[in-house]
Curated annotation (Swiss-Prot):
GO terms for molecular function: DNA-binding transcription factor activity; DNA-binding transcription factor activity, RNA polymerase II-specific; protein dimerization activity; RNA polymerase II transcription regulatory region sequence-specific DNA binding; transcription coactivator binding. Residues 529-573 are annotated as: NTAD. Residues 496-514 have a biased composition (Low complexity). It comes from Gallus gallus. Induced by reactive oxygen species (ROS). One of its GO terms (biological process) is positive regulation of DNA-templated transcription. Keywords: Activator, Cytoplasm, DNA-binding, Hydroxylation, Nucleus, Repeat, Transcription, Transcription regulation, Ubl conjugation. This is Hypoxia-inducible factor 1-alpha. Residues 8-27 have a biased composition (Basic and acidic residues).
Amino acid sequence: MDSPGGVTDKKRISSERRKEKSRDAARCRRSKESEVFYELAHQLPLPHTVSAHLDKASIMRLTISYLRMRKLLDAGELETEANMEKELNCFYLKALDGFVMVLSEDGDMIYMSENVNKCMGLTQFDLTGHSVFDFTHPCDHEELREMLTHRNGPVKKGKEQNTERSFFLRMKCTLTSRGRTVNIKSATWKVLHCTGHIRVYDTCNNQTHCGYKKPPMTCLVLICEPIPHPSNIEVPLDSKTFLSRHSLDMKFSYCDERITELMGYEPEELLGRSIYEYYHALDSDHLTKTHHDMFTKGQVTTGQYRMLAKQGGYVWVETQATVIYNTKNSQPQCIVCVNYVLSGIVQKDLIFSLGQTECMLKPVESPEMKMTKIFSKDDWDDTNSLFEKLKQEPDALTVLAPAAGDTIISLDFSSNESDEQQCDEVPLYNDVMLPSSSEKLQNINIAMSPLPASETTKPLRSNADPALNREVVSKLEPNTETLELSFTMPQVQEQPTSPSDASTSQSSPEPSSPNDYCFDVDNDMANEFKLELVEKLFAIDTEAKNPFSTQETDLDLEMLAPYIPMDDDFQLRSFDQLSPLESSSSGSQNAATITILQQTQTPSTAADEIKPVAERVDDVKALIVPSSPVHVINDTSSAPASPYSGNRSRTASPIRAGKGTLEQTEKSCPGAPSLITVTLNKRSTAMDEELNPKMLALHNAQRKRKMEHDGSLFQAVGIGSLFQQTGDRGGNASLAWKRVKACKTNGHNGVEQKTIILLSTDIASKLLGQSMDESGLPQLTSYDCEVNAPIQGNRNLLQGEELLRALDQVN
């Protein structure tokens, strides 16, 4: 009898035998299956190198695809191919820019052409038999399913069912920009333009042996073309292709110049304009949908569409558009388009848009703009040529024609012989106009002080229409009695050599001719008088021709007349009440004030006249005062001056800022040389309220600029330079400069000296004063009170009661 242990061993041995037999049977079945799959793989139309390395799943997948393709091919009637056609079959795929793909109604890739490897990096056998949804972008699946659907609904008579398909599909790509292949997990998305048809195939023998009918086979045949990135285009573009860049709203930001030869447009006229303005109206809906796909998928191909030419008609164009993303934030930045022109201009004489008309592309100039261009030209010809120019612009003549109710001012071209002779004697300077005769020029001593380059001005001189200049002069010559305020400054006159000369020298406070109205123009005054309008109207000649020639035409006087607009005009007030200064010396002689005229360029003739005078001068120093209106350094208690007298007055202008004037008043002994005297009066408070606010603003601007750019007050006072006049009684008609003297009184002659340091703005302020007889406390700022307090012998500022007493004495 067997023990229980022996029974257990028998069962275990039998179980192991069964398992071993089972493993052997499975091994046998697998080997037989492998043989079958191996034989099946060799039946597939594949190279041996490919079929020998296929697994069972791949063999089954490829076999199913092959059977479907056979069914698809058997559905149609195959025609016998000629030998020539068979030889050309190998060139079809090379001619394609993409690859061929056949999809079943379920989305399985029945067939993929072998050139898919060059486009996507994936091999033909890796894709065939797989579902297309495994290799496409998830956002494109819905659109792809819609394209695979074949609607069998009723179709209207006369219309066939639309079987064409065109869409954009993002598919995995394992190719890099350098041509290398990466793993499928590192693949990127590439946009494919898929175009084709959906087909329904019925086999010839659609009935099986059982008698039921086979369903038709539906498939989608596509040609997939990848859209190249603009940065990867290596083939040079031909003459029928042009590049363009657009903003996100499809406005041109760049266009290739080849568009001019192809469509007639200039690249500059397209910038900033939308591309939709140049689309044919029938293609606008299709292009709108294409642009929507472009922003969704990154790249599109528009297909053939019509783009309007410039002069009329259209051309057929196909565009590849690519969205360029910012590398930092991955946001869309711009759109680059490669445009292929497929045809010439079609229907050139047909206008499809208003933009094709020349009047819309070329802006029309108004008559006012035409007249401005005509009168702003420098190359003025005679009156006949001007008439021809105006005759060519009939619309512009209406601008010059007077309207109803306008006053027609007649132009007086007559001239006086005395004025012509006087104009011939006036030397014209490039910067400063000196309207005086030769007799007056002998009595004027000009202190040359060149201006910096930033303050140079152009002369108010023109070779333009003289009639307009005369019109301005006639408006600037009102009756002298009606003037309320005039800029007058007495001129320096040499001491008369005879009593007859002294009797004939009389002071005339009013300007006698339009020459006296000429003045030097400051940079700040240019805005006041609107000189830019004068320059455009008179076509200013920047360089005077023969400025010192005494043979000038009779029209130079009118050219020198300034132009003052009516809205910027201000009334002039005469400055004829000049308070004389009493002199204690009976032997002192009459002295006139010196007029310092500043100009930018030193004339050669004037330089020749000053040279002999300068040779007799030992030393000449200019004193520049930057700040405070008036500084008086009084070494004595009082300094009486000689009575005031002058030859005549001329109209003066506001003096340039940045130039200081120094004038000295001292008591002269009998027999001593005559001294130059400058008399100034304090500005009355009541007059300040009546002054033009524009002139006050100009006065303050000049004072501020002088305080910023000039030297300090202490340096100016330390120089102590002063001008002194010496009379040459031997017949010399000109004034000579003498050595600059110190401010302190010399002990050996006992002459009391008083130095007055004045600014050009203060002179202009005093000229605006109502009368020299009136006196009042000037308006002082806080800065003036700190600097200009009376200085006593101890050289300390007054404080407290002493300051109050000093102010009471002034009042």
